[in-house]
């Protein structure tokens, strides 16, 4: 087979066969095809797309490039996997799993790190010392005891995706919808769960800038899931606001734990999305018959600390700092500064991406993959867009392990509008 002929076919809007796609992915992984030729193919796909069959062939080839995590028949409970396309302040994955375990469900997840303004679940968990570098054997052991685990993506799970993404990242092909669908679902299908729930974010702080794009990608993934005969459900959620009151790592874990403890100090939209997602999962898995029943049962497991206890059991098995979690001392930044309202009025933020960039400047995110994260760095939002505030009311609190520079404070103030 000839890679140049395959590139020419896709360039001229022709369909690729399964053998041709397998040849390309195999050549990518074993390095028999140079990066520049795979990059040319990616650009041809960006311009001309993939039909349903081509996308199935690509996703299958990506899955087959590595190992598949299997838990049944040894594990008897329904196994859930939930994925988010990422957003600012998204700590849903941390809070969701302990609640689902309360309903006799198992929850497994392969997760990633953050780059830029979106924080990764792995970074957030490492802020409380959770070990996410766990192999399949130990993942099964933790699942059997705690009915949940979260681990980082390893080199033996869909290695083709890691290689493809690195090329997409430097060739302007990250935003190809078929390539996004293949990337997400290859990782989800490499873990053999019974149900997959995908939260597709849209808006300022998401890769889908509008709901129409979110609908397109969800439809592509729905068709792909049917070809694999997998149960996949989608939620489209607004990312024009920070999800919750916090942005960072340990500070986001704290808000997730506050939710599990049924404390009131959590963001309204975060709480609503949590209830919506858990309700959907309980209905689809037939753990509840109605939305009303689901809401009542969710409130019960929160009010009685059942979900929080599940969280603690799981964290302890993955070597998290359980003592600091139980006595609420894991988030203790050395430096902080408050930004207060200079007049009364209605607040708005110029851009939540710029707000998230302040968090990165404080140390909560990475500019480059090798950057070290300050787990104590972050932002607390005392006021959200369209809320009325009075003069001297706190708007933001900035946190860091290092002294916070005045130019960063000034930068944060410029994002705030009071009308």
UniProtKB/Swiss-Prot annotation:
Q: Which GO terms describe its cellular component?
A: cytosol
Q: Which InterPro entries does the record match to this protein?
A: Glycosyl_Trfase_fam3, Glycosyl_Trfase_fam3_N_dom, Glycosyl_Trfase_fam3_N_dom_sf, Nuc_phospho_transferase, PYNP-like_C_sf, PYNP_C, Pyrmidine_PPas_bac/euk, Pyrmidine_PPase_CS
Q: Which UniProt keywords apply?
A: Glycosyltransferase, Transferase
GO biological process entries: pyrimidine nucleobase metabolic process; pyrimidine nucleoside metabolic process
Coiled-coil intervals in this record? none
Instruction: Give yes or no: UniProt keyword Transferase.
Output: yes
| Reactions catalysed, as given in the entry | thymidine + phosphate = 2-deoxy-alpha-D-ribose 1-phosphate + thymine
Q: Does the keyword RNA-binding apply?
A: no
Molecular function GO terms recorded: 1,4-alpha-oligoglucan phosphorylase activity; thymidine phosphorylase activity
What is the role of the protein in this entry?
A: The enzymes which catalyze the reversible phosphorolysis of pyrimidine nucleosides are involved in the degradation of these compounds and in their utilization as carbon and energy sources, or in the rescue of pyrimidine bases for nucleotide synthesis.
Give the multimer and partner information. Answer: Homodimer.
Recorded protein name is Thymidine phosphorylase
């Amino acid at each position: 087979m000839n890679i140049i002929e395959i590139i020419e076919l896709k360039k001229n809007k022709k369909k690729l066969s399964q053998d041709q796609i397998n040849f390309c992915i195999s050549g990518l992984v074993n390095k028999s095809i140079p990066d520049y030729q795979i990059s040319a193919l990616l650009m041809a796909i960006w311009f001309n797309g993939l039909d349903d069959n081509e996308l199935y062939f690509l996703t299958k080839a990506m899955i087959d490039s590595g190992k598949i995590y299997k838990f049944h028949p040894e594990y008897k409970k329904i196994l859930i996997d939930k994925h988010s396309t990422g957003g600012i302040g998204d700590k849903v994955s941390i809070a969701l799993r302990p609640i689902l375990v309360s309903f006799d469900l198992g929850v497994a997840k392969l997760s990633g790190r953050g780059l830029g303004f979106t924080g990764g679940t792995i970074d957030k968990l490492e802020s409380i010392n959770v070990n996410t570098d766990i192999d399949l054997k130990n993942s099964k052991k933790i699942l059997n005891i705690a009915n949940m685990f979260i681990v980082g993506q390893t080199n033996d799970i869909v290695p083709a995706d890691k290689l493809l993404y690195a090329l997409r990242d430097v060739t302007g092909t990250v935003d190809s919808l078929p390539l996004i669908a293949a990337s997400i679902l290859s990782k989800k299908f490499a873990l053999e769960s019974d149900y997959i729930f995908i939260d597709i974010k849209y808006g300022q702080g998401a890769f889908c800038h509008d709901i129409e794009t979110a609908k397109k990608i969800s439809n592509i993934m729905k068709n792909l899931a049917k070809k694999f005969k997998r149960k996949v459900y989608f939620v489209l959620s607004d990312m024009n606001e920070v999800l919750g009151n916090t942005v960072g790592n340990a500070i986001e874990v704290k808000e997730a734990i506050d939710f599990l403890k049924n404390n009131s100090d959590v963001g309204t939209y975060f709480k609503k999305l949590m209830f919506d997602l858990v309700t959907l999962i309980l209905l689809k898995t037939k753990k509840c018959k109605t939305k009303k029943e689901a809401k009542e049962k969710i409130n019960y497991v929160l009010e009685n600390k059942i979900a929080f206890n599940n969280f603690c059991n799981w964290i302890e098995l993955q070597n998290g700092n359980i003592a600091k979690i139980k006595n609420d001392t894991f988030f203790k930044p050395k430096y902080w500064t408050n930004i207060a309202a200079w007049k009364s009025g209605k607040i708005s933020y110029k851009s939540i991406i710029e707000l998230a960039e302040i968090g990165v400047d404080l140390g909560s995110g990475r500019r480059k993959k090798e950057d070290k994260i300050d787990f104590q760095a972050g932002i607390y939002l005392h006021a959200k867009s369209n809320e009325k505030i009075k003069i001297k009311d706190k708007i933001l609190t900035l946190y860091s392990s290092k002294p916070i520079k005045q130019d960063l404070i000034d930068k944060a103030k410029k994002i705030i509008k009071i009308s």
